Amino acid sequence: MTDQQAEARSYLSEEMIAEFKAAFDMFDADGGGDISVKELGTVMRMLGQTPTKEELDAIIEEVDEDGSGTIDFEEFLVMMVRQMKEDAKGKSEEELAECFRIFDRNADGYIDAEELAEIFRASGEHVTEEEIESLMKDGDKNNDGRIDFDEFLKMMEGVQ
């Protein structure tokens, strides 16, 4: 077992591994311990993942190192964990986009110092003008006096 495979197993509960194994085995028709790359998309969709054709091609290219056209169960686990992490990252970015829209009171695509102060006041948090200025300075990477969505994402990376 490679380090990647051991890491993938440590990320998953025994229940998840058993669920993945059951799905994997359904497509391992001959019981040989591997599935064809063509069947991979079907298995992933059964397990609640939604890879695009491009993502599947990239995943398969990474996983099927020997070019055999088949993927064994350990390689499959590594791939599923990668996909789960990607999905989680996408969801958290969607949630942050929703927060940004809420904070951007005037819907101009930016959060300014006044909007930032309002956020804290609404949450009952007492924040001084200096603290607001400091937060703006830290978040406003291009020094235009306001925080755009990309700057907001970078700011929030440090919080999570």
Swiss-Prot record:
The modification N-acetylthreonine is found at residue 2. Gene3D superfamilies: EF-hand. Ca(2+) 4 binds at residues 140, 142, 144, 146, 151. Ca(2+) 3 binds at residues 104, 106, 108, 110, 115. Ca(2+) 2 binds at residues 64, 66, 68, 70, 75. GO terms for biological process: regulation of muscle contraction; skeletal muscle contraction. Keywords: Acetylation, Calcium, Metal-binding, Muscle protein, Repeat. The keyword Protein biosynthesis does not apply. One of its GO terms (cellular component) is troponin complex. This is Troponin C, skeletal muscle. It comes from Mus musculus. The gene is Tnnc2.
